[in-house]
């Protein structure tokens, strides 16, 4: 009986976690803080983490299909079959180094202005970083043609 109760509580926690991620509520808190509502990001670390998390996720969303396509088309090539590893590494390493700095800059501007950031703004800034990197990378390839 106790095991069933514990399993039921674990399922509630997992459902709550999934709901939290899907609803963009990165930081759950009670409304006894200085933030305007439960979903706004007020501290520098919360804003930085929100933007950084979305930058990493969106970068992987861009790079994972490219790596899978490269793996499918180049799997029999002697040297080029290792290109998907490079694509995946760039999808992870880029946001880890560049995304950390740009996310900190965005969060610093918000903190210096004394504004709080909504979770949707963190999504827009994070995905925007990856989108700009994608566009610049594509334009650099076109410039070499």
UniProtKB/Swiss-Prot annotation:
Cytoplasmic side: 72-81, 139-145
Record bears the keyword RNA-binding: no
GO CC terms in record: endoplasmic reticulum membrane; nuclear envelope
Residue ranges that the UniProt entry lists as topological domain Lumenal: 1-50, 103-117
UniProt membrane topology term: Multi-pass membrane protein
The name this protein goes by in its record: Transmembrane protein 170A
GO biological process terms on file: endoplasmic reticulum tubular network organization
Family to which the UniProt record says this protein belongs: Belongs to the TMEM170 family.
Annotated transmembrane regions: 51-71, 82-102, 118-138
Lineage: Eukaryota, Metazoa, Chordata, Craniata, Vertebrata
Residues the record marks as carrying a glycan: 31, 37
Function field: May regulate membrane morphogenesis in the endoplasmic reticulum (ER) by promoting ER sheet formation at the expense of ER tubules.
Pfam families: Tmemb_170
Predominant place of localization: endoplasmic reticulum
Record bears the keyword Metal-binding: no
Subcellular location per the Swiss-Prot or TrEMBL entry: Endoplasmic reticulum membrane; Nucleus envelope
Keywords: Endoplasmic reticulum, Glycoprotein, Membrane, Nucleus, Transmembrane, Transmembrane helix
Gene that this sequence comes from: tmem170a
Source organism (scientific name): Danio rerio
């Amino acid at each position: 009986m106790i095991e069933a109760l514990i399993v039921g509580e674990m399922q509630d926690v997992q459902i709550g976690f999934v709901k939290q991620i899907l609803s963009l509520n990165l930081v759950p808190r009670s409304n006894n803080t200085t933030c305007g509502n439960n979903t706004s990001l007020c501290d520098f670390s919360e804003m930085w983490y929100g933007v950084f998390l979305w930058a990493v996720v969106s970068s992987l969303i861009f790079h994972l299909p490219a790596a899978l396509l490269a793996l499918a088309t180049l799997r029999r090539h002697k040297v080029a079959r290792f290109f998907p590893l490079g694509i995946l590494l760039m999808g992870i390493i880029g946001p880890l180094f560049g995304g950390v700095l740009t996310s900190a800059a965005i969060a610093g501007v918000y903190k210096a202005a004394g504004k709080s950031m909504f979770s949707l703004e963190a999504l827009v800034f994070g995905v925007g970083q990856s989108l700009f990197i994608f566009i610049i990378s594509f334009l650099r390839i076109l410039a070499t043609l």
